[in-house]
Design a protein with these regions (language model features):
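Short Pro/Gly-enriched beta-strand edge/turn motifs at strand-loop
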Residues: 3-10, 131-137, 157-159
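Short, well-ordered beta-strand micro-motif
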Residues: 24-26, 155, 162, 175-177, ...
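Metallo-beta-lactamase
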Residues: 40-42, 134-140, 160-251
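Active-site HxH/HxHxD metal-binding segment of metal-dependent hydrolases
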Residues: 44-45, 54-154
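Conserved beta-strand hairpin/beta-sheet module of binuclear metal-dependent hydrolase folds
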Residues: 1-56, 176-189
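C-terminal regulatory/interaction regions
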Residues: 256-321
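A short catalytic or substrate-binding loop motif that flags glycine-/basic-rich loops and adjacent residues
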Residues: 15-18, 146-148, 167-170
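Divalent metal-coordination and catalytic microenvironments
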Residues: 25, 37, 70, 90-93, ...
Length: 321
């Protein structure tokens, strides 16, 4: 789909998120393309991207720059293949490289501890780790040509693209803002219909990841946005309204958690199961529901509204009376 000089390309993803949208920006003289995110490392995704580029009168050789919104598999997976075969400059936040430098076994150990101590059944944790380990080991984060920081402008391109660091869903998450057209590419930071999850690795690294996410959402209210293009679901025409909806959603969820804890002590996994119920039936959705619940509980604990109690290696949460 094309809007002005922007193309949204839907690429298949071989797990529960189903798809990702990557974005192509045509240069004013139609000589080159900027790619925002690139899709998962699958033949289906690569062929779909290549065919789309050819259908609009370009070739993969016209790709000049790829900006990665964040280091989650469906957003960066094709980087290595593109980098090896085409002269594309790769840009990303330095935190993406920081994650790549962490010992992989340490990450697995931290994830295991996080979910076990928050009440998730061991069989579910093991199943997820097997899936996660396969994806990450087979698709390492490649070398980045240029790191970009909050407030930077992408160099050597005709578009005036400003980089906005927007942590929360991921520590390295970026939004990209075109000052001239007032278009923003929001990655997984602002999505229509669903609320972005607080990323798993960021849950481990941050004491209050939900608060960080809320603060970076608030920052986007300072930008005049005509339309935003997320990595999933539809473009958002009323981005400020959507941001406020997401902020209200998280406040409502915190109140729901507190009400759930009125008369009993529960684990994060138990609370997440009550919130999401049967719609979170797959292992991927179980992980998402648990991580989001942990993020809320960390925020509530920081605000002095809940306590955690460690019993037999598992954290139980109770409401502060």
């Amino acid at each position: 789909m094309k809007q002005n000089n922007i193309h949204r390309v839907r690429l298949p993803v071989p797990f529960f998120v189903n798809h990702v949208y990557v974005h192509l920006i045509e240069s004013p003289d139609n000589s080159s393309l900027i790619l925002i995110d690139c899709g998962p490392a699958t033949d289906d995704a690569f062929i779909t991207l290549k065919n789309y580029i050819q259908s609009i009168g370009y070739s993969m050789d016209n790709l000049e720059t790829c900006i990665v919104t964040h280091g989650h598999y469906e957003h960066y997976g094709l980087l290595e293949r593109i980098k090896q075969n085409y002269k594309v400059k790769i840009l990303a936040h330095p935190a993406m490289l920081n994650f790549a430098s962490i010992d992989f076994n340490e990450i697995l150990s931290l994830i295991y501890e996080l979910f076990i101590t928050n009440g998730m059944p061991k069989v579910s944790v093991d199943k997820f780790l097997n899936l996660y380990q396969g994806i990450i080991k087979e698709n390492p984060i490649p070398l980045i040509d240029e790191v970009i920081y909050n407030g930077d402008y992408v160099s050597n391109i005709p578009e005036k693209l400003q980089i906005i660091w927007a942590p929360g869903h991921a520590e390295d998450h970026l939004c990209i803002y075109n000052e001239n057209t007032k278009v923003m590419f929001t990655g997984d930071h602002v999505i229509s219909k669903v609320t972005p999850q607080i990323g798993l690795t960021y849950i481990i690294q941050s004491e209050n990841p939900l608060k960080v996410y809320q603060q970076s959402l608030q920052e986007l209210l300072n930008y005049d946005i005509e339309v935003s293009y997320p990595g999933h679901n539809n473009p958002i025409e009323n981005t400020h309204e959507r941001i406020i909806e997401i902020l209200k959603h998280h406040k409502s969820r915190e109140n729901w958690i507190l009400k759930t804890l009125d008369s009993k002590k529960l684990t994060a996994f138990e609370i997440g199961s009550k919130i999401f119920g049967e719609i979170r039936s797959t292992i991927g959705h179980s992980i998402i529901s648990c991580t989001e619940t942990i993020a809320h509980l960390k925020s509530l604990k920081a605000d002095g509204k809940v306590n955690d109690i460690l019993k037999d290696g598992i954290y139980f949460y109770e409401k502060v009376s």
